[in-house]
Amino acid sequence: MSGNSNDKTHDIWNGEAGKDWAENQRDLDDFLRDAMDQLLAQLPLSPGMRVLEIGSGSGTMSMEMARTVGDKGYVIGLDVSKELLALARRRVKAAALDNAAFRDLDIQTQALDEAGFDICTAQFGMMFFSDPVLALQNIRAHLTQGARVAFNGWADAGNPWFSIPLRIAETYLGPLEQEPNDGAPAPGPLAFSDVSYVTEILAEAGYADIEGWRSEIMIRHPKGLEALMHSIQYVGPISTLYRLKSPDEATRAKIAGDIRKEFTRFVQPDGSVAMPGLVSMYRCLAP
């Protein structure tokens, strides 16, 4: 299997992004828990199923699914970040989950040895392909007839956790400019925001019974505002802006101070943080 290069995504996730996510895995799991629970609710998981996860990251959702499908089923997670793959493998070993494995593989350009998957899913893992139609076609080649596919992506509105930090950061650093991608959204956190666009490319890639919708989530951080301030550096457009602009520590401190002031309203009486979020959800079948 071959295809267009996805080298830029590989470089990002094998640089600071992958390292940062690995180091902050527990906090980010808390941060994204509601989104993951909503996605898992779209999957008809049962014992014995074979599951493929795209962009499996630190392995959190793969581990949840492995427990559900049991010893007669299995989960294979794909990622391109060596740092996150190493962490995921350590975690499944520590949890004695022998039915979960992880592959260093880009499904846009490479074939997986295994096939015949009953389910394919991705928790914010589909939107980093430079050629998403090709990637989706290659995924379909690994699925059984009638396999369920469900995944999510960030919506372009309704997410104060990244719209507020991005607006503030851009006042100091200038706008986040996206590189051209032949008229399609550039790979990144918002690439699969547009429901019409994503349902169209799913149809082009050969899927059936395609549905797309927006879903409200709650983004929570039980450790409080300062922990959230730390996490937002690694999730969403502000992380991209920081990588591109390389602000010095003094500028980062000013940005953080302004963000903190606006985020204070989301602090709960128990000291935790809860704020609304919005995701784009998708599901379809492999014909």
Task: Place the predicted regions along the sequence by residue.
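Conserved class I S-adenosyl-L-methionine
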Residues: 2-49, 60-64, 87
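C-terminal helical/coil "lid" or tail adjacent to the Rossmann-like core of SAM-dependent
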Residues: 2-6, 10, 17-24, 210-269
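Class I SAM-dependent methyltransferase SAM/SAH-binding core
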Residues: 50-110, 134
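Helix-to-beta-strand junctions that scaffold the AdoMet/dcAdoMet cofactor pocket
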Residues: 70, 129-130, 143-145
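A short acidic, Gly/Pro-enriched loop at the edge of an enzyme's catalytic core
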Residues: 108-119
